Amino acid sequence: MEGESTTAVISGFVFGALTFHHLNSGSDTEGFLLGDVMGEAKNSITDSQMDDVEVLYTIDIQKHVPCYQLSRFYNALGDLNIPELKKLLAGQKKSQNVIGWYKFRHNTEQIMTFRERLLHKNLQEHFSNSGLVFLLLTSNPATETKSTHRLEYALHKPQDGFFHKVPLVISNLGMSDQQGYKTLCGSCVSVGLNTAIKKHRLEFFNEDGALAEVNRISDMHMTLQEELKKTCSQLVESENSVEQLLEAVNDLKKQIAEKKLLMEEKGNKVSEDTEENVLLCEAFRRFFPQSALLQSCRLSLGGRQIPHSCSVSHNSSDVNELTLMVKQYDFPEAHRRQAGKRKAHSKQLGKTSTKKSRLPPFQRPQSDNSDSESSDSEKLLCTSGTETDGDIVQSLNVEVSRSKSPTF
């Protein structure tokens, strides 16, 4: 990508002479600027573009030629007076070219007039220089008493039919190359200074003339750089180890969460399988206190048999409400077995009068009026003297197979 930039440079001596001539004249003044235009191509290599060429033009204003009579080399229409123009520039050297012209105006603004534009176009055609510049200087009073004036100046250059301002730099006021520090010092001829330096030279300088402190600081800087590299490598290793540990911790957390879910699911199943049917256990103890076989049987709420016998008193508040009243259709086989055994018992009443019942008979407790109304659909479950423990367990197993949670 190619670009152009233009900068004008004027020495402090030339600029001071221009302002001196302007301030000592009673009217507007004008003249020509002499100097040279230099071009320099600057090639910058960037990441986006391999070649970035920029052309820098420097307008060096070296001298000015004043015109002591206003409008001497042109008329009111802006047409040039060629003979007067040649007389004005006759004594100049050939090495110094006309690079522009200037004009001082009192109490006006920094705007080119229409006549100045026409005159500038005619001067471009006469000198065959399309890069001709125009320096406009104006002065305005800065106070009401007009004791202080403000001087403004601008350098104009035509481009594409328009006049653009060109930066003007005064060399002894804004040139950075002349304001820089000197890196080399001149020879010192002072005898006293040489004596003082020789006396303390070994404390501050080495044998080769270099500053000792500078070398020490450079050595310390190199040592610090090496330590910094080591620390950076250790930091990278520690960061990598921390990342690995964090990944391992996250994996362990996931495994723990999965195990917790599995344990909760298993715990729910185990609790259903191992939780004892307390009401059934208390019912066996209350209604069959002398049957060790029934009291040794334990069933869970899910209907599964628990291998260990229960030896704990549950002390449930619902035990007092337990009865042996069950619905008739719950024990059809037990009802038929009991009816047949009652008939056999009536026939052999005399023979079995001496037999003792293993389980004491229990009569049905008195109930409310509501229980008496439903007595047709319920019956009393009791044992006779001829029933054995096997018969009782068989009857209970039939019921358990049909209903895993019997109602008492």
Swiss-Prot record:
The question of whether DNA repair is a record keyword is answered with: yes
Question: Where is there biased composition of kind Polar residues?
Answer: 394-408
Location, primary (coarse class):
nucleus
Sample GO molecular function, one term: microtubule binding
The entry's protein name is BRCA1-A complex subunit Abraxas 1
Q: Does the keyword Nucleotide-binding apply?
A: no
Location of the motif pSXXF motif: 405-408
Region (Disordered) location: 335-408
A Pfam family of this chain: MPN_2A_DUB_like
S-S bonds: none
Q: What does this protein do?
A: Involved in DNA damage response and double-strand break (DSB) repair. Component of the BRCA1-A complex, acting as a central scaffold protein that assembles the various components of the complex and mediates the recruitment of brca1. The BRCA1-A complex specifically recognizes 'Lys-63'-linked ubiquitinated histones H2A and H2AX at DNA lesion sites, leading to target the brca1-bard1 heterodimer to sites of DNA damage at DSBs. This complex also possesses deubiquitinase activity that specifically removes 'Lys-63'-linked ubiquitin on histones H2A and H2AX.
Reported modifications of this chain: Phosphorylation of Ser-405 of the pSXXF motif by ATM or ATR constitutes a specific recognition motif for the BRCT domain of BRCA1.
Q: What is its quaternary makeup?
A: Component of the BRCA1-A complex. Component of the BRISC complex. Homodimer. Interacts directly (when phosphorylated at Ser-405) with brca1. The phosphorylated homodimer can interact directly with two brca1 chains, giving rise to a heterotetramer.
Q: What family classification does the UniProt entry report for this protein?
A: Belongs to the FAM175 family. Abraxas subfamily.
What are the Phosphoserine sites (modified residues) in this protein?
405
- Organism phylogeny: Eukaryota, Metazoa, Chordata, Craniata, Vertebrata
Origin: domain of life:
Eukaryota
Q: Which residues form a coiled coil?
A: 210-272
The scientific name of the source species is: Xenopus laevis
Domain (MPN): residue spans on this chain: 7-155
Output the GO biological process annotations, alphabetical, semicolon-separated.
attachment of spindle microtubules to kinetochore; chromatin organization; double-strand break repair; mitotic G2 DNA damage checkpoint signaling; mitotic spindle assembly; positive regulation of DNA repair; protein K63-linked deubiquitination; response to ionizing radiation
| Keywords, in A-Z order | Chromatin regulator, Coiled coil, DNA damage, DNA repair, Nucleus, Phosphoprotein
Where does the protein end up?
Nucleus
Gene for this chain: abraxas1
Q: Where is the composition biased (Basic residues)?
A: 337-358
- Could you state one GO cellular component term attached to this entry? BRCA1-A complex
